[in-house]
């Protein structure tokens, strides 16, 4: 074979290999940029924030998934299965309106969790055939000229998903981060609502995300007693 031809072929092959190498570098670089990077975090800060958030979640778990806000059987303010909320209870947790409830919720849970709560609990759920679930709580506006102040009303037929008492050990341990989520481990004590003598201890792994004004829970914190549970 002609030496000049061989040289040309060698140059072409070398050029192709160089191009392939450059392409590989570019692809590898883009892939690396697309990879999820585990965020850095201050362990003590996350653990301290978790303790506060868990106490808030204890109240919200009761309101959203537990027995709910107590109500009074005032027939003058009743509407179907809705009755006015107990003002004494609301005052004890610093809530007067649904907006107050949302404020506490948004100080506790991530945007994603808040969105799900609002869609499934604070809003009625509809299908093509009509309503399939009524909002658990509604804000009632009585008007400026009415002697009765605005109030929250409670849907009295809402299902109670979690009745057991849940307590969180303040000794929280930050474990790791996965992407933007930081995971912590907390020891949870669950006391059966049917028999206070029955107690279960579990390790619950909870995710947190950092938003503009602080940390938020990004996973549920409720728990249920199981008779046959073994730790």
Enumerate the language-model features and the residues they cover.
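Gram-positive cell-envelope targeting signals
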Residues: 1-46, 56-57
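Mature, Sec-exported extracytoplasmic domains of Gram-positive
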Residues: 32-231
